[in-house]
Structures are given as structure tokens and as C-alpha cells.
Regions:
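Soluble catalytic domains of enzymes that build or remodel membrane lipids, polysaccharides, and related
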Residues: 134-325
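Non-catalytic terminal accessory segments
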Residues: 1-121
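N-terminal signal-anchor transmembrane helix
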Residues: 90-145, 150-168
């Protein structure tokens, strides 16, 4: 839990710093002077009020975390805009009459956040064809991860995605973690599991845990535990694999790993060598491992295919580069 307190403290500190910067940035803007805020004190008061009003409006309209994300986008782009326009002004030899840097930052923030919202609420099917010398024959797999039920779409939206999966006519459906989220309600979890139970496949549906499925907070807050989730999944014919493997049709293995977050919770999980050491290496092995951070060991253990989630499409620069270090 210590890491989460550290993250919370950093988030609060960065948010406060961002609000102070934005308040000062608004106070210094030529636009503020045009509103009749001539004195320094009145400008600062206006800047602080505008920054707090903007942040509060975002928090009430979206939620607190999304308000923080929007604030940081605006702050970073304001800093970048001020830097670029300072260079231009240096060569221009005279100040700008309008706050072009601020306007550019707002427009770019709006464009970036709108694009993010659109991508977050629209799901695309990506097709991959994988060839292997092993005798597995044709196998049609549907994989999904990070549905985080209730976060970007509700159970009705999830049911629509299930229908799209069914139209792919899969031999098997694999879920690589974060099926539910810390904010998912018990009823949403139950309805989503029922939707999974409607899938018609040759070999069934298999699930491996992600870092959010068991929840980071008090189970009472969302109304169910990790064990409750397992019960509902099994009730709907979903096979849950936790450091376990199963041989299917004497052709291929599905190996589901415990998530890396189990280690952070003080719980053990098997190494890749331990998971694969007793398997027939002539048969194709498919690993479900939510967090893609163990590729070297998976290669050494001679895993054939590793399927993961967690990165949500790579996230944003530069955080995507930082994540590659861990």
C-alpha cells in the first residue's frame, strides 16, 4: 500500500503546482488585462479564481482524476507554448499583442483530450496471423483485455462487444486481465460475466487476472472480492487460470499466470520456468500474462506465444517509454 500513498502524495503535489502555475499564467495573460484587471493584486485574484473554477468544473463534469489529467495537459502545453513563443518573440524583437501561446495550449489540449476520449470509447478489431512449425493446425483466437467494466462502457456496451466477438467465429476466447475495475459494481460484474457465458466457441473461454480484477481497495467499496469474481466466471463456464495450465485437444496449452501485482501484494507467483518445465515442448504454448514485463524469461522458457494487456495501446509519450524500463 505504501506505493499508492506515494503516488497519491505526488499526484496532490503535482496538481497543486499545476493550479498555481495556471493561476499565475492567467494573471500574466494580456487577455486578463483587457478584462479590466489592471493591478497586480486583482490579476492574481482573477487568475486564482479562474484556475480553481476551471478545475472544479472539470472535476464535476468528468471526475477528479480526469480533471487532474486535463489540468496537466494544459500546464505542459502552456509551458511548451511559452517556450516556443519566447524564442519567436526574441527574433521578432517585439511582444505579441495577444496571448497566442495560451490560446495554442488550450486548442492543443482540447484536440489531444478529445482524441483520447474518442479512442477510449471506440474499440477496433486488430487481426494477426501467426505461423508456427509446431503441429497445431488452424486455430482462431479472440483475445481481449482491459475492458475495465463500467469505466468507459457499461454492461450493455460490453454485450455489444461480445456480439462482435461472436461474429468472429472463434475457436477459443482468451481474457488477459483487467476484466473489471476498482470502480466496477457487483451488479455490473455479474452482468458482464453472464455476457461471457453467452459466447459459443469450440474450446471455451479462459481468463487470467490483471492488476485491477481483485481490487486495490476495500472490497466493500465495490461489493465483491476476487473470489466472488471467480465464482461468477466459473458459473458462466469461464475457466480461470492462476499459475495453471491446461492442454486443449492434445494440440496446445493455455497457461494463465498470476499477475505481477501479486508480488507487490506479498503473494508468490511461479516463474516461467516453473510454469513450463513439465510441459511437452512439441506442443504450442500460449501464455496469458496481463503485464508484458517478463519477455526475457518467457523467451528463455521457450514460450511460443505471450498474450498481454495492461498498456492500453501504449499510453502516451513519454510515459510509454518510462514503462518499458520496468
Amino acid at each position: 500500500m505504501l506505493i499508492w500513498y506515494i503516488i497519491l502524495a505526488i499526484t496532490i503535489a503535482v496538481t497543486c503546482a499545476g493550479l498555481l502555475f495556471l493561476a499565475n499564467r492567467i494573471a500574466r495573460s494580456p487577455f486578463t488585462a483587457k478584462l479590466g484587471q489592471e493591478t497586480s493584486k486583482r490579476r492574481k485574484i482573477f487568475g486564482a479564481a479562474a484556475a480553481v473554477f476551471l478545475f472544479t468544473a472539470l472535476a464535476l463534469t468528468l471526475n477528479l482524476m480526469n480533471a487532474v489529467i486535463c489540468l496537466l495537459h494544459i500546464v505542459v502545453l502552456c509551458l511548451a507554448g511559452d517556450f516556443v513563443f519566447a524564442i519567436i518573440q526574441h527574433f521578432r524583437k517585439q511582444p505579441f499583442r495577444h496571448d497566442y501561446a495560451g490560446m495554442a495550449a488550450l486548442l492543443l489540449s482540447l484536440a489531444a483530450l478529445s482524441t483520447g476520449w474518442y479512442l477510449d470509447h471506440h474499440v477496433w478489431t486488430t487481426n494477426y496471423t501467426i505461423e508456427t512449425p509446431k503441429k497445431i493446425k488452424d486455430l482462431r483466437i479472440v483475445l481481449f483485455a482491459d475492458s475495465h467494466i463500467g469505466t468507459t462502457f457499461d454492461t450493455r456496451g460490453f454485450a455489444e462487444h461480445i456480439s462482435e466477438m461472436q461474429r468472429q467465429n472463434p475457436d477459443i476466447v482468451l481474457i488477459a486481465g483487467d476484466f473489471v475495475d476498482d470502480g466496477t459494481t457487483r451488479q455490473q460484474m455479474i452482468e458482464a460475466c453472464r455476457a461471457l457465458g453467452s459466447l459459443q466457441t469450440t474450446y471455451g473461454v479462459y481468463f487470467a487476472f490483471g492488476n485491477h480484477d481483485k481490487g486495490y481497495h476495500d472490497p466493500a467499496a465495490r461489493g465483491f472480492t476476487g473470489d466472488d469474481l471467480i465464482t461468477e466466471l466459473k458459473k458462466n463456464n469461464v475457466k480461470v487460470l492462476q499459475d495453471e495450465n491446461t492442454l486443449i485437444d492434445n494440440r496446445f496449452y493455455i497457461i494463465g499466470r498470476k499477475d505481477f501485482s501479486e508480488i507487490l501484494r506479498g503473494n508468490p507467483r511461479q516463474s516461467m520456468n516453473e510454469l513450463l518445465q513439465n510441459l511437452n515442448k512439441e506442443k504450442f504454448s500460449i501464455i496469458l500474462d496481463h503485464q508484458p514485463n517478463d519477455y526475457n524469461n518467457q523467451t528463455d522458457a521457450e514460450a511460443d506465444l505471450v498474450l498481454s494487456g495492461h498498456t492500453h495501446g501504449g499510453q502516451l509519450f513519454p510515459l510509454n517509454k518510462v514503462c518499458l524500463l520496468y
